[in-house]
Amino acid sequence: MEKITIRLEEKDGAARINEPVGLGIPLPKGTVQAIYQLALMNGQEPITVQLQPLAHWPDGSLRWVHASFLVSLDSGQVKDLELVKQQEPNATTSHEPAIEQTSDRCVIRTSTGSVALASNSLHWQVTQKNNPGTPSTVTLTDEAGLPCTAEADASWKITHTGPGFVAATLKGQWLKQNNEPLSRFECELRIFLETGLIQVELTTHNPKRARHRAACGILATQAPCTFGNWR
């Protein structure tokens, strides 16, 4: 397989430090049978990347893959990365992150500390090495400006694991102050293992209206991520 060039360009005039990038990449028919055969390179240096098969050719080879990774760019910088097929891929290499599950929480270890997800709750806590934990949550207010309560259906579910990130999802419903259901929600946390960055995506669904999706990225040292009013 020929190298596939991925060109990244910073156009907003701001330096980017370890920002998440996700994109789909098409592959030629019959060239790649499994994702472990692929590597993402920055010159001669490999980049930690999490690859997920999206589609296959009729012969079973990969047709599309989704790549997730972190990248740093200076203001106005253009950077070319290359997706290559490894000559000697190692199918047995393990990239399983350290995850500890207890009755009251799920803890994901990162290179900078840990992220603890509270069971049956839309709360999590980020702890960095030699620093106290930072509690985080998502809040919602109703049309009167009153805070709603997040009632989870069950505990957080780990949906993706790999060398780049761990993803966890929590589903439930928002309740008004009188316990009347307001809307459904689904929250996904994408925890990047190299930096402790957490990417938050929240979808709310009011059966009487359309779905609404919001997302933000927070560092381990930043304040909790909060979303605005439901109208």
Go through the PLM ranges and name each one.
Residues T93-H95, Q101-S103, A152-A154, R184-E188, ...:
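Short alpha-helical segments and helix-capping/turn motifs at coil-helix boundaries
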